[in-house]
């Protein structure tokens, strides 16, 4: 029971380590001149190749019928995160740093909460103190993001970082750092990411097969992001060149870990914990990226950005505190979802159903679960 309780926490923490690793690898690849649009395209081509065989063989007996409504939802999912968010995210990272990008993505839980509230995936009662904490925390989180962008402050000396490398990224890529532009792109990307997470939760209610949904998202996302990359990089075929270097590593790592496994795992967790829980551990990624970025990429830290990141984390955990007060009700809901599975097991041994074959029994058992998920 203890392991079952902690499994979602361990899983999302592991995801944050995966995301942190990609931030460092992707920034290194971008510093080497890789196009952010080509990276988004290659990432989801790799993800499709990786996840599709698992989805085909493991879901072929349980995959629901594809409807036009579900297809359009998946088409939108492929547009929101693999295409729009990834293009904006990597472009914003090119204008800033890996640490700044990781810190800015802490606004994601706030945006996810607002959208979950709008789509009634999150319980909010403005008269209750825990709901007020969610709303206040969201406002504080956005304020912290603005503080990071506007206030720079003095340089924080780190023994392993070289302050003379502050403009290193700009000289390597030919792109001058622009915090305002970079922060704006990342923030818009986070809005799309939050929309993706909430829409994924909605889609799973009518198409409750996480592997197949992930495969479809990656496949359609790879097509859409490739179209965008071909348009932006037209007349520049060298942008698509890739060798055994950091560019290939970024595409493979991002495709397998962050898209293939990441989309699937967050889909499994949000079916019981909700979309806000999935995004709640982003500050851990920020801490990991800040440490690794200063060591590997020689990134420097400024007081204003650290203060802004602290404000973001305080706001985030105000949201999480309010979210924690909803856990008893969601746990009760989870128990209700498990009840139909036990009911057929009591009915099946009765005389009326003694002659029922195993195929019919499986139908009786699975049907309540499907209805419940819908």
From Swiss-Prot:
Record-linked SUPFAM superfamilies: Multidrug resistance efflux transporter EmrE
Record membrane topology: Multi-pass membrane protein
Main location class: membrane
Metal-binding recorded as keyword: no
Region (Disordered): 350-374
UniProt GO BP: L-glutamate import across plasma membrane; seed development
Residues annotated as transmembrane: 9-29, 38-58, 64-84, 99-119, 135-155, 182-202, 212-232, 249-269, 284-304, 306-326
UniProt feature coiled coil, ranges: none
Domain EamA: 19-147, 191-320
Pfam families in UniProt: EamA (PF00892)
Keywords, ordered alphabetically: Membrane, Repeat, Transmembrane, Transmembrane helix
InterPro entries: EamA_dom (IPR000620), WAT1-related (IPR030184)
Compartments in which it is found: Membrane
One term of GO molecular function: L-glutamine transmembrane transporter activity
CC terms in the record's Gene Ontology section: plasma membrane
Family membership noted in the UniProt record: Belongs to the drug/metabolite transporter (DMT) superfamily. Plant drug/metabolite exporter (P-DME) (TC 2.A.7.4) family.
Name used for this protein in its record: WAT1-related protein At2g39510
């Amino acid at each position: 029971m203890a392991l079952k309780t902690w499994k979602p926490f361990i899983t999302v923490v592991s995801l944050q380590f995966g995301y942190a690793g990609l931030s460092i690898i992707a920034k290194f690849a971008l510093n080497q001149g890789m196009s952010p649009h080509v990276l988004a395209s290659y990432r989801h081509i790799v993800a499709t190749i990786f996840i599709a065989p698992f989805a085909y063989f493991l879901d072929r007996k349980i995959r629901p019928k594809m409807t036009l409504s579900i297809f359009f939802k998946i088409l939108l999912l492929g547009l929101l995160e693999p295409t729009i968010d990834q293009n904006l995210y990597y472009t914003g990272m090119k204008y800033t740093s890996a640490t700044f990008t990781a810190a800015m993505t802490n606004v994601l839980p706030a945006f996810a909460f607002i959208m979950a509230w709008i789509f009634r995936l999150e319980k909010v009662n403005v008269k209750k103190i825990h709901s007020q904490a969610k709303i206040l925390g969201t406002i504080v989180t956005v304020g912290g993001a603005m503080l990071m962008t506007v206030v720079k402050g003095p340089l924080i000396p780190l023994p392993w970082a070289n302050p003379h490398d502050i403009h290193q990224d700009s000289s390597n890529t030919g792109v001058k750092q622009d915090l305002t532009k970079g922060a704006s792109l990342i923030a818009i990307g986070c809005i799309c990411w939050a929309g993706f997470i909430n829409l994924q939760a909605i889609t799973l209610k009518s198409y409750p097969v996480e592997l197949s949904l992930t495969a479809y998202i990656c496949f359609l996302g790879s097509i859409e992001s490739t179209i965008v990359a071909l348009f932006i990089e037209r007349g520049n075929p060298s942008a698509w060149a890739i060798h055994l270097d950091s560019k290939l590593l970024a595409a493979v790592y991002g495709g397998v870990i962050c898209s293939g496994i990441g989309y699937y795992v967050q889909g499994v967790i949000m079916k019981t914990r909700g979309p806000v829980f999935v995004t709640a551990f982003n500050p851990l990624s920020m801490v990991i990226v800040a440490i690794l970025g200063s060591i590997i990429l020689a990134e420097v830290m400024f007081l204003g950005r650290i203060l802004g990141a602290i404000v973001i984390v305080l706001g985030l955990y105000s949201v999480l505190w309010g979210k924690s007060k909803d856990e008893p009700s969601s746990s009760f809901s989870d128990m209700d979802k498990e009840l139909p599975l036990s009911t057929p097991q009591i009915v099946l041994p009765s005389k009326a159903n003694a002659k029922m074959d195993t195929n019919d029994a499986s139908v009786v058992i699975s049907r309540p679960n499907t209805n419940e998920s819908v």
